[in-house]
Amino acid sequence: MCTGCVQKQYPDRGNTCLENGSYLMNFVGCANCHQRDFVLISDRTMVNEDEEEIVTYLHMCKNCEHVIARHEYTFTVVDDYQEYTMLCMLCGKAEDSISVLPDDPRQTAPLF
């Protein structure tokens, strides 16, 4: 993918995992046509296999269709937790885990 189009490669996004969209704060402009315009999403695929959902797509320049980055988002349920991951040169890297139970056992305080 194109390192000249992004301010920072794979910025740490904490637990912000995007299934769609673009992180435009990290987009400095197209290295090919030198325009800073909207970023298109192209070739979006969604695959469901063995309790895992994988979404991939390309970020492309609106003006010249230059490929800026490849975006990958995954969702899976492991034990009692929904696990999310994102990896993209433009949008960054992130992971999140959310309990499917009403009260997250990791958030409860010990009684003693």
Swiss-Prot record:
Zn(2+) 3 binds at residues 59, 71, 88, 91. One of its GO terms (molecular function) is zinc ion binding. One of its GO terms (biological process) is regulation of mesodermal cell fate specification. InterPro entries: Churchill_sf, Transcrpt_activator_Churchill. Disulfide bonds: none annotated. The gene is churc1. The keyword Transcription regulation applies. Transcriptional activator that mediates FGF signaling during neural development. Plays a role in the regulation of cell movement. Does not bind DNA by itself. Gene3D superfamilies: Transcription activator, Churchill. PANTHER family: PROTEIN CHURCHILL. Induction: Up-regulated by FGF signaling in embryos at mid-gastrulation. Belongs to the Churchill family. This is Protein Churchill. The keyword Metal-binding applies.
